[in-house]
Amino acid sequence: MTDSTPLDSEFLNQLTATIEKNLANEQFGVSELADALSMSRSNLLRKVKKASNLSVSQLISQVRLKRGMDLLRSGSHNVSEVAHQVGFSSTSYFIKCFREYYGYPPGEVGKRNINQEPIPVAPPPSNNKK
């Protein structure tokens, strides 16, 4: 994250909450987020980049992948169920994005130390294909 102000943090919290409300909607992307926040697309892109140093697509992917990690760590869902719950219509694409972000496939989550906080190894993919 960049040198963010309290306003940036508040904005990012609002964004994250809005994304989480629409998590299962695979069609929820940049335009839908801008509409939900009553902002222009260009203003949203600029503010997100300033507040997080990520693109809007990357931020949406990051929220989806982190929620996916939470669901996998709970142990009550398989990878395919989690992929669909966090807005990926393709399980294989979820696995690809997860592996790029965390450095290991989602099937290994249960085998890893559950007390250790997962550390992303790369920024989330900016391509919002599912």
Model-found features: residue ranges?
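Short, Lys/Arg-enriched, Trp-marked, Pro/Gly-tolerant hinge/linker segments that flank
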Residues: 1-13, 35, 50-58, 62
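Inter-domain helical "communication" segments and dimerization helices
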Residues: 1-25, 110-130
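Conserved catalytic/ATP-binding subdomain
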Residues: 6-9, 28, 42, 77
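Basic, amphipathic alpha-helical hairpins
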Residues: 16-28, 48, 52, 69-78, ...
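Basic/polar phosphate-binding segments, predominantly the helix-turn-helix DNA-binding elements
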Residues: 30-59, 83-108
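Terminal helix-turn-helix DNA-binding modules in bacterial transcription factors
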Residues: 50-89, 111-130
